Structure formats: structure tokens, C-alpha cells
């Protein structure tokens, strides 16, 4: 197993300083560039790194955007324009881990704009991609050893759409 991991590490050494082993690959109808710009406008340390276009042999119109490679806060993504064959589902989501209510409110507002607010901190953005805006403290509460506190936090979360850190903490501490 170690030999295989070392082999993968060697294979990933290219001119790219930080080639990641696993990259989320997102299938869009024809909104890949628009979506990448949208996501890059929301997250810090984000940018589009490369755009490729369809050539004569590709299934898309000649010269139209095929893929957009972009980075969101250090995580590399690829977005593909490939037609309406596949749609995003809630079976896959991206978790945004936040420390404060201000951060939670910011990401919730930006990502849910023209999208759908679902439940328990989940939302779908305007492209149908699912996100969870999750306070780090909630994960700590749910992993706690006191079953009563954990159950109170879970119950409070299940009744929320956008999460409220103060209300979650109050429930966890038995002050709701």
C-alpha cells in the first residue's frame, strides 16, 4: 500500500506546484464559466486557472468553453460544459465549515441567492449544486460524549433551515 501511495505521489509531481490527487469535476449544461466566476467571487483565495475550448472534434460548438479549471480557497475544481444529460442532486454536497454566525450568514446569503433554501443548513445554489453551511461548533456538539446534549443540538438543528449558532449552543446547553 505504501509503495502504491509513493508511486501516486511521484506521478503527481508536475510543473504544477500543488496538483491534488482528487479533484471535484462538475458537469454543467453550458454554465461552467459563469458558475466558476460566481463561486470565485464568493470564496477567498479563489481564481480561474484555465479555460479550454471545444475544437472541431468536440461535441460542443467550435470555440465554445469546454472546461473551466478553478480554485476555491485552495481546492481545485473542474467545470465541464457538456449539455443537459446530467443534473446535480442532493446526494453530493460541498460543506463550508464556518466559525462565526457572520461567516455563516455571508456564505448562506451568497450561495442561496436565486437558489433554494432547504433544511438543516443545506441549500441549493442557482445552478442546482448542494451546499451545507456548517458551524464547526455544531460538529463538535454532535460528536460530544453527552447524549442528552448531543440530542438537544440535533433536535434544534433539525428544526432550522439556516443554522443559528447561538440557538444551537443554547439547545446543547439546555437553555432553549
Question: For each predicted feature, which ranges?
Answer:
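Vicinal oxygen chelate
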Residues: 1-19, 49, 71, 79-81, ...
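Core segments of cupin and vicinal oxygen chelate
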Residues: 16, 26-74
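Residues that flank catalytic or metal-binding motifs in active/ligand-binding sites
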Residues: 20, 66, 90
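Short loop/turn microsegments at loop-to-beta-strand junctions
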Residues: 23, 65-66, 118-120
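Short, well-ordered beta-strand elements within core beta-sheets of diverse protein domains
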Residues: 24-27, 93-99
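Residues that form or flank phosphate/diphosphate-binding pockets in enzymes
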Residues: 34, 89, 102
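Short glycine/serine/proline-enriched coil/turn segments at secondary-structure junctions
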Residues: 59-60, 85-87
Amino acid at each position: 500500500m505504501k509503495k502504491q501511495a509513493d508511486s501516486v505521489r511521484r506521478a503527481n509531481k508536475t510543473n504544477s506546484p500543488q496538483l491534488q490527487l482528487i479533484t471535484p469535476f462538475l458537469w454543467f449544461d453550458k454554465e461552467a464559466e459563469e458558475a466558476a466566476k460566481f463561486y470565485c467571487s464568493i470564496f477567498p483565495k479563489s481564481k480561474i486557472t484555465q479555460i479550454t475550448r471545444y475544437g472541431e472534434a468536440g461535441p460542443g460548438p467550435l470555440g465554445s468553453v469546454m472546461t473551466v479549471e478553478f480554485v476555491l480557497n485552495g481546492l481545485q475544481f473542474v467545470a465541464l460544459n457538456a449539455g443537459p444529460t446530467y443534473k446535480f442532486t442532493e446526494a453530493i454536497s460541498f460543506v463550508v465549515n464556518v466559525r462565526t454566525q457572520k461567516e455563516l450568514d455571508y456564505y448562506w446569503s451568497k450561495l442561496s441567492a436565486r437558489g433554494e433554501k432547504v433544511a438543516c443548513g443545506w441549500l441549493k445554489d442557482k445552478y442546482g449544486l448542494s451546499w451545507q453551511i456548517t458551524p464547526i461548533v455544531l460538529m463538535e456538539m454532535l460528536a460530544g460524549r453527552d447524549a442528552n446534549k448531543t440530542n438537544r443540538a440535533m433536535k434544534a438543528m433539525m428544526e432550522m433551515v439556516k443554522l443559528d449558532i447561538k440557538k444551537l449552543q443554547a439547545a446543547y446547553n439546555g437553555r432553549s
